[in-house]
Amino acid sequence: MNQVNESHSRASDIWREVASLFRPPGRLPVAEAIRRYMRVPRGANISGPWESSLTPYMIDPINTLSAREYDAVVFVGPARTGKTEGLIDGWIVYGIICDPADMLVVQMTETKAREHSRTRLSRTFRHSPEVCRRLSPSRNDNNVHDKMFLDGSFLKIGWPSITVFSSSDYRRVALTDYDRFPENVDGEGDAFTLASKRTTTFMSSGMTLVESSPGRDITDTKWRCGGAHEAPPTTGILSLYNRGDRRRWYWPCPHCGEYFQPVMDNMTGFRNNPDFVAAGQAARLMCPHCRGLIAPEQKRELNNRGIWLREGERAAADGSITGTPRNSRIASFWMEGPAAAFQTWEQLIFKLLAAEEEYERTGSEETLKAVVNTDIGRPYLPRSATEQRKSELLEQRAEPVPRRCVPDGVRFIEATVDVQGGKNRRFVVQITGYGEQGERWIVDRYNIRHSLRCSPNGESLPVDPAAYPEDWDLLLTDVFHKTWPLAS
């Protein structure tokens, strides 16, 4: 039986507290409830409110946690995005105050579960008055891994084991740092499948949350992206992301207004600088539409103007969204390091360049993999596989051009001639077309083997410019005065 606070001296106080247990669930959006009720610990005795304007990309994933059309929410992102604070701690606070129900939180190890309970949750509860007064006053009801509340709801903080995932039913289950879980939990299967089984009793009100930075290697080195939002083939959280509706984070360009993804592919200005600190300070994000440069000081403003788009959707410059979105029972979100609120571009670029230098110096990929996974927020492709893919990438870039024609984009052509002697004397001619930015095409390649001189039998003799200067005249007729048609 739930205990009532012993400090009450009047029957009306007892009745008021008992009556509060029968209140219907609050109708606040989850993010608004977190902003209103959760105090975020900033140290042992310092706290402040949760500020959605710092991490606006968390609002949609957080609010989706109460959407009945989804069975699960999957969030993929680098470290320093505020995902644990908002999605895990915030969801716990929302459940305690607005919609009480049993909840299971699974950390990657028993040690991390204990640490999360003691250093994050205990401080959050202590600094959040509305949470603190709902905790059961009984010492037997609260320990590191189990917490009971006055309304009878129960919070379990566990780790990946079949014992934790068996028997009990929970309306809410949260798996944090998922890619550091074992792929097979005690021989019973993956953690997501085991966890989601715990919520099925509650039907559409049950919800499973998974959040993590990528931590598994790409399994198919020959994979080619089938869509702008598709993740590479990996196990772990990106596999769950691909099952979902595949939402990516977009910014509006401050120059042209078009929406684009703030991802590492669009970072520029930091290569070829031996000073990694200066390189990080010079880093800018480039809009792929107008090639306008965005300074790091604009990140917070653009995050607050950003939107999530599902695969199949497109945002116009005026903010209108068109297209047919991908449908799924899983709402999945993926963002990369350039948009992370608590990591600067200077820090990100410095870590990347230092890790690449360490790889070049030692051949070890461990630091580089950690940076790609946790700072950039991408799955890692081993460098050995990258080298193997270079020929495939070149093949993908091949353009259909008719033979012996000048391709579109050529501004001028150049002829080079190599003189070959010996028994097989000849001129080797190559015609190369040059375009903008150093782009070039091979237009034609051929040999000039025969001169205009004839043997007593009337047969053409091989060229021999060293002995017969008139053989050089062949370059006028067969090279300089020769023409090639345009491809279009």
Predicted segment positions?
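Nucleic-acid-processing active sites and adjacent nucleic-acid-binding tracks
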Residues: 149, 380-410, 421-488
